[in-house]
A protein has these predicted regions:
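Long C-terminal interaction/binding lobes of large macromolecular proteins
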Residues: 1-256
Length: 256
């Protein structure tokens, strides 16, 4: 004789006492309020959804983390998806790359705290070091008030001035790797000595001397603007001390 399966029962309706208990149990939950972002660009080149309000960010939620863990997306697509869920008052596609990195650092900071632990293998003695970094201490270089976009760039070899627009999240497909980036440099140049014809621009950019190409790439890369992710690494096992990029691994958006 088979025993009938018990049907799952729904939780009973909450009472006022239940609500009080739940509120007490969650008393120490971190704030999920939106935090105003002081972007390196100072919002200077953006058309905000509501010009009377700032750009804000909220901490990641458990739901966000579940989506991240189950997502088949990786790299920039996954990071953009996270930012799209947490950033308010701006169309994500127009966010400058120099602001995106700042946003990612702040998203990690407001979600898990200002400290970030990473395991670094010493290039000298090969020992693993457990290092704690303080994300809130990373210096930020803000743009000058007089800066414009597109940015005028003087090419030292050609002795000509061009204007180049700063890359945004929408441009990431043109910057996947160095080969693709070099082939698409012309897309970011809006003017060469007053000439705006894209055919002329494309032909000139293809023939740029290396020094001039590097001058162009330097500006596109932010030229020192934005959050500085260079940190000092001091090995605990040997005398090595060196500057390095903040080691951002797959666990950056976890509670490490």
């Amino acid at each position: 004789m088979t025993q009938a399966k018990k049907q799952p029962t729904a939780p009973q309706e909450a009472t006022s006492n239940d609500d009080t208990i739940i509120e007490e149990l969650l008393a120490n939950i971190p704030s999920t309020e939106d935090i105003v972002l002081e972007l390196p660009s100072k919002n200077k080149f953006y058309t905000l959804m509501d010009p009377t309000k700032p750009i804000t960010i909220r901490p990641l939620t458990f739901e966000d983390e579940k989506k991240m863990m189950s997502s088949k997306q990786g790299g920039s697509k996954m990071l953009n998806s996270l930012l799209g869920s947490c950033i308010k008052n701006i169309n994500l596609s127009q966010v400058l790359q120099l602001d995106k990195l700042y946003m990612l650092m702040k998203l990690r900071e407001v979600s898990y705290g200002e400290t970030y632990q990473a395991k670094i293998n010493c290039p000298s003695c090969k020992n693993d070091n457990d290092i704690t970094f303080n994300l809130s201490k990373l210096p930020v270089n803000y743009i000058e008030e007089e800066m414009v976009n597109p940015v005028p760039v003087y090419l030292p070899v050609l002795q000509k001035t061009i204007k180049v627009k700063l890359p945004t999240i929408a441009d990431e497909g043109y910057l996947v790797n160095s080969e693709i980036a070099m082939a698409n440099l012309w897309r970011f140049v809006t003017e060469i000595e007053g000439h705006v014809n894209k055919r002329i621009i494309s032909q000139v950019i293809q023939k740029l001397p290396l020094k001039d190409a590097h001058a162009l790439l330097k500006v596109m890369g932010g030229d020192g603007l934005g959050i500085d992710t260079k940190v000092k690494f001091a090995c605990s096992y040997c005398p090595l001390v060196e500057d390095m990029e903040l080691p951002i691994g797959a666990d950056f958006f976890t509670d490490s």
